[in-house]
Amino acid sequence: RPSSVPDRTARNPTTATAPLAFFERAVAFGAEHDILIAHDAAYSENTFDGYRAPSILQVDGAAEVAVEFFSLSKAFNMTGWRVGFVAGNASALKALSLVKDNTDNGTLRAVQCAAAKALDAADTLLPAVNAVYQKRRDLVCNALADAGWPTAKPQATIYVWAPVPEKFRGDSGAFAEALLDQAGVVVTP
């Protein structure tokens, strides 16, 4: 039987979001089966159009059965600095701390100081960063729609997903090659 269940919303990289009711069910499941729920909330702060991603830790009882991982990479333009934090179940955090203490030397102090400054300025920084991401999202989605390839505008994350055109269904590699050859655009098949 599993000892933990991972979950990701806003999903990296699918852009899917979940309502608080989803987390309520996850917490109830974790409590019923004595399973730790590990929620990857790396993109939870990158939201658009008034949407705010809920936290699993908003749910009553979540601190007993869940941990939530956060990253400053995209929300604060700190990609590559590998800085984040985790909150939730105290015994899980203690175990994670023990593992972390014995597997690496921690995060460079300068990066920790930059992260602290970013978090202190979150009310100013996050709207500015998200405005840039939203503008990029809108440019991509509008350009795709103008090309006859409409896509849904995601409420969260930095990704845009578009269906592979009908003539390339079943061969995303051929589509990626055609897009590179004909438009100079690189995508992952």
What is the predicted function of each stretch?
Residues 1-189:
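PLP-dependent class I/II
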